[in-house]
């Protein structure tokens, strides 16, 4: 599979999460939060896509000229564990190379608010990534947003489906803003520069 990024092709940025107001503030929905902020920056609202089970925003990011990129922001509406279906449908509809796909997701094995950008690799037990990888292979970009490990013996499923704590919420806007910056840097400047700036 060709994983070379194509500057002339559109980028597909999929913020992962679960649909519905009861999940909106969960740790597992931080990908949706980042996608919402990116849409706000573009100045557009998410709309239901006619051919995929997803909400999308189409726009451009970056300065005028060769660094300006066409971007499709997406929030799969299929629930986290089957994110691969909507992402694949959007990939096919917009003819996006796999190397131009970015999944934004929560990551248990990284401290809260810390970012890690990478291309390819395993799913680390993340069911949203597992679903996408099953459909597309592993060679897409990831922006991993650290949420930390659950306290004590709390089951992982309970932890990720709970809202951020009151202490975490004090910094959440800052961290989501930084993650959106990282996505923009990845799309505009490339992975290595974005990693240098945001892999903390």
UniProtKB/Swiss-Prot annotation:
The keyword Zinc-finger does not apply. It is found in: Cytoplasm. GO terms for molecular function: peptidyl-tRNA hydrolase activity; tRNA binding. Its EC number is 3.1.1.29. The active site is at residue 28. Disulfide bonds: none annotated. Keywords: Cytoplasm, Hydrolase, RNA-binding, tRNA-binding. HAMAP family: Pept_tRNA_hydro_bact. This is Peptidyl-tRNA hydrolase. It comes from Streptomyces coelicolor (strain ATCC BAA-471 / A3(2) / M145).
